[in-house]
């Protein structure tokens, strides 16, 4: 395990690759670096069924990228103002107070998603059709991805996630 604050305040030009899990505050204050977190080759775990990141990931991130082959805990991408990320699920309060950046979640989200979110974009793969029950509707609107531009943008991010993490789940969505 990488412990607390893996990649905190990492700047442009730095790339961190972790084979294993990380605890809370991964990418806190991320400032341009790329962080890739994947399961070790010898692992028999299914990435999208397991948590690989702790709580409060990308807190206050301003730029950079995070790719993780697994789920995040609570308060994922809180106060994100510019980072781009692809993960495979998160617990409650995801994208809380987010003001910018792009979040792609290839799995379920927890309750109170996007509370206080005022900017940025979040793409959620809603296989269980539960998103509407979990999103906080007070500051966001949501809809299906309908234009070719956004479909291509999303496809490219998922492809990059697959390249960075080897995720089988992202390979399905390319």
Indicate where each model-derived feature is located.
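Long, distal/terminal scaffolding or interaction modules
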Residues: 1-172
């Amino acid at each position: 395990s990488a412990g607390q604050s893996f990649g905190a305040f990492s700047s442009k030009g730095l790339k961190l690759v972790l084979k294993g899990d990380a605890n809370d505050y991964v990418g806190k204050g991320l400032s341009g670096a790329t962080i890739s977190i994947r399961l070790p080759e010898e692992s028999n775990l299914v990435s999208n069924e397991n948590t690989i990141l702790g709580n409060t990931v990308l807190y206050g991130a301003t730029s950079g990228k995070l790719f993780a082959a697994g789920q995040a805990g609570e308060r994922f991408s809180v106060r994100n103002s510019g980072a781009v990320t692809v993960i495979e699920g998160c617990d409650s309060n995801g994208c809380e107070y987010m003001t910018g950046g792009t979040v792609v979640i290839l799995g379920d989200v927890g309750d109170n998603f996007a509370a206080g979110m005022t900017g940025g974009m979040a793409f959620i793969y809603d296989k269980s059709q539960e998103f509407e029950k979990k999103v906080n509707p007070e500051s966001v609107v949501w809809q299906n991805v309908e234009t070719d531009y956004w479909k291509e943008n999303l496809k490219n991010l998922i492809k990059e996630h697959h390249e960075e993490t080897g995720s089988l789940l992202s390979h399905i969505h390319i």
